[in-house]
Amino acid sequence: MVQESTMICVDNSEYMRNGDFQPTRLQSQQDAVNLVTQCKLRANPENAVGILSMANSVQVLSSLSTEQGRLMMKNHSIEPFGKCNFIAGIKIAHLALKHRQNRNHKMRVVLFIGSPLEEIEMNELVKIAKKMKKEKVLCDVIMFGENESDGHEKFSTFVDTLNGKEGSGSSLIVVPQGSSLTDALLQSSVCKNEDGQAAFGGGGNGMDNAFGMDVENDPDLALALRVSMEEERARQAAAAAANGGAADSGADAEVAAAAAAVPLEEMDMGAMTEEQQLEWALRLSMQENAPAEQPQVQHEQMDVDGAPAVGGDNLDDLMNNPELLQQIVDDLPAANAEKDDDKEKK
């Protein structure tokens, strides 16, 4: 098995907010990054993967690591902003690979491009490609979201320069709008071993590989990742809502109060927001899980209330009235049980 260190360059420009890839370009790209991470780490237990974002100033989110959970956490912390600096991203990824711990590892860059290619000179790309080829650095370029023939031509030349006479090792993958990014990668050389086999089993189902993994092989991890992702999206939505005006907050409070006043059985799920649906489900769960012994507790409370109060002056009266005291003792459940036992013995 080939030992390889891979740096993944993520495009997190403002263009990643577009919804031509469901649910957005960024979230679709994050799922694809998880998929590539899974493939690389499963191909060889000694493989290492790193992640960097390219918006404005390039930022290395995770240096080369074998910890899958850490890489996924860093991946899903990426936010869209600014413009992408692809040239700087490639250079820094190359530099990070040169400082890999295992010098026997092959070096590879996986570059995601989903933004328009602006101010990128062909000569500069070719120069970088020649330097990477000299140092035996491979590169897979995944282009999605923007149908620019000029951009495709530039990076096609970039990949051809990297491959040289051998004609293999690096690849250019163009994913059309409206298709699944993860499904396209599953069918490409990015997620296949040297023998052409997929890095892990499972079909190209977009749902199964939404987090870059085969759900059947590791359902617990898949569920944990989905829950974590939904919690993060809910947190971001709550933070965005909190930044709204006071009027919006007041309106939400009125809606919540009105929802609380309506009986649970009469709630219209279609008319509620996601937050109200969660609150409704919580209230319903609390109602269903109410203690079943509550009526018995109330009955016992009524019995106690019916007994004479023992306190203050009433205590002296009770001690001076042995007949009343005996009556109270006889009424206790334990005393009744003893009487029944005595009758059975007789």
UniProtKB/Swiss-Prot annotation:
Residues 216-235, 273-292 form the UIM domain. Its main location: cytoplasm. The keyword Repeat applies. Residues 5-190 form the VWFA domain. Broadly expressed with high expression in the pharynx, intestine, hypodermis and spermatheca and weak expression in the excretory cell, body wall muscle, vulva and somatic gonad. The keyword Nucleus applies. One of its GO terms (biological process) is proteasome-mediated ubiquitin-dependent protein catabolic process. Disruption phenotype: Temperature-dependent increase in lifespan with a modest increase at 20 degrees Celsius and a 30% increase in mean lifespan at 25 degrees Celsius compared to wild-type animals. Reduced fertility with no sperm produced in the spermatheca, accumulation of a sex-determination protein tra-2 in the intestine, no embryos in the uterus, and an increase in the development time to adulthood as evidenced by an expansion of the proximal oocytes at a young adult stage. Reduced ubiquitin-proteasome system function (UBS), particularly in dorsorectal neurons. Residues 337-346 have a biased composition (Basic and acidic residues). Residues 290-346 are annotated as: Disordered. Binds and presumably selects ubiquitin-conjugates for destruction. Required for protein degradation and ubiquitin-proteasome system (UBS) function and regulates proteasomal subunit expression. Involvement in UBS might be cell type specific. Regulator of the autophagy-lysosome pathway that may confer resistance to autophagy by regulating the expression of autophagy-related proteins such as lgg-1, and by regulating lysosome formation, possibly by modulating elt-2 activity. Required for fertility, sperm production, and sex determination through regulation of tra-2 protein. This is 26S proteasome non-ATPase regulatory subunit 4. It comes from Caenorhabditis elegans. The lineage of its organism: Eukaryota, Metazoa, Ecdysozoa, Nematoda, Chromadorea.
